[in-house]
């Protein structure tokens, strides 16, 4: 019999952390964070990182493991998560993976293609070429070498377009060709849950309420400190996290406070929409309604 591993997925502000803490207190579980924002040190308020009190109730693995100046890929996450899962199982406990970064869950569950690591020099060349000729021209280049990826990647998505070209220039193979080969899938009995409110308006209200609370907790001060370091910028993955980008732009004088709030809430709602889109097509998923009384009992039943 394969060891059991639990996934608890869901959109932002859906109540994942609260439910995970309840389960950790009532069952022999250890929590592994699956969140591309929580990995960064010093990004606590805007990422809704669990508080000191919450971490005392249920410690989270894979938070505060990178500086905001550093990158962290789905492959990095998969390697780290597999090591944590193995350690938790050796302790006789059940790994509980909690978060909303669906690409991380997918990488862990299905394995990853052997893509080359980022090359800063090639990325700089691609950016310089885009500055000179425009991303439309680079998209035409991608269409010539990888029409399948070009169909999927929009010319106005420079991050993914740049990565597809970078992969080809490093390896001589297209992104489509490389992604046809994947590493081994997860060798465990995985039970997957998703939690979300039944009504979209409820989730939208929760997102707006949570951002207001973040502002009251000192979110602008947090971003001000990050900005003052001098080594961070908006092109870094850490500063592309929702909320942080909009607050940074506000501090740069691009728009006023009210516009910042409006843009940050809108961006977070768009993130939640993308997360739900992923989840609706996810196979073998057990749905829970946010705040429902029977959620803990349902999870504990599957822990046995």
Swiss-Prot record:
EC number(s) given by UniProt: 2.5.1.75
Binding positions (substrate): 12-17
Taxonomic placement: Bacteria, Pseudomonadati, Pseudomonadota, Gammaproteobacteria, Alteromonadales
Region (Interaction with substrate tRNA): 35-38, 159-163, 240-245
Function: Catalyzes the transfer of a dimethylallyl group onto the adenine at position 37 in tRNAs that read codons beginning with uridine, leading to the formation of N6-(dimethylallyl)adenosine (i(6)A).
Organism: Shewanella sp. (strain W3-18-1)
MF annotations from Gene Ontology: ATP binding; tRNA dimethylallyltransferase activity
Gene: miaA
Known cofactor(s): Mg(2+)
Segment forming the signal sequence: none
Record's protein name: tRNA dimethylallyltransferase
Protein's GO biological process: tRNA modification
Catalytic activity: adenosine(37) in tRNA + dimethylallyl diphosphate = N(6)-dimethylallyladenosine(37) in tRNA + diphosphate
Site (Interaction with substrate tRNA): 101, 123
């Amino acid at each position: 019999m394969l060891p059991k591993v639990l996934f608890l997925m869901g959109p932002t502000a859906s109540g994942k952390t609260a439910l995970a803490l309840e389960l950790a207190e009532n069952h022999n579980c250890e929590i592994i964070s699956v969140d591309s924002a929580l990995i960064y040190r010093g990004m606590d308020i805007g990422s809704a990182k669990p508080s000191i009190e919450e971490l005392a109730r249920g410690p989270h693995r894979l938070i505060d493991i990178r500086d905001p100046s550093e990158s962290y890929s789905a492959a990095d996450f998969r390697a780290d998560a597999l090591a944590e899962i193995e350690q938790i199982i050796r302790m006789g406990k059940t790994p509980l993976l909690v978060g909303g970064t669906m690409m991380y869950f997918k990488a862990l569950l299905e394995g990853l293609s052997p893509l080359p690591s980022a090359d800063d020099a090639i990325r700089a060349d691609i950016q310089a070429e885009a500055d000179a000729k425009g991303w439309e021209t680079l998209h035409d280049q991608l269409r010539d070498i990888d029409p399948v990826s070009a169909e999927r990647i929009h010319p106005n998505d420079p991050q993914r377009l740049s990565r597809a070209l970078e992969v080809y220039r490093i390896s001589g193979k297209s992104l489509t060709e490389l992604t046809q080969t994947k590493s081994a899938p997860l060798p465990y009995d995985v039970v997957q849950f998703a939690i979300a409110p039944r009504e979209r308006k409820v989730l939208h209200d929760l997102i707006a309420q949570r951002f207001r609370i973040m502002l009251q907790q000192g979110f602008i001060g947090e971003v001000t400190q990050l900005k003052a370091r001098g080594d961070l910028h908006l092109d870094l993955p850490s500063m592309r996290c929702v909320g942080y980008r909009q607050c940074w732009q506000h501090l740069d004088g691009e728009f006023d406070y009210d516009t910042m709030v409006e843009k940050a809430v809108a961006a977070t709602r768009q993130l939640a929409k993308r997360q739900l889109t992923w989840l609706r097509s996810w196979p073998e998923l057990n749905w829970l309604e946010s705040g429902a009384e029977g959620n803990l009992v349902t999870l504990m039943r599957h822990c046995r």
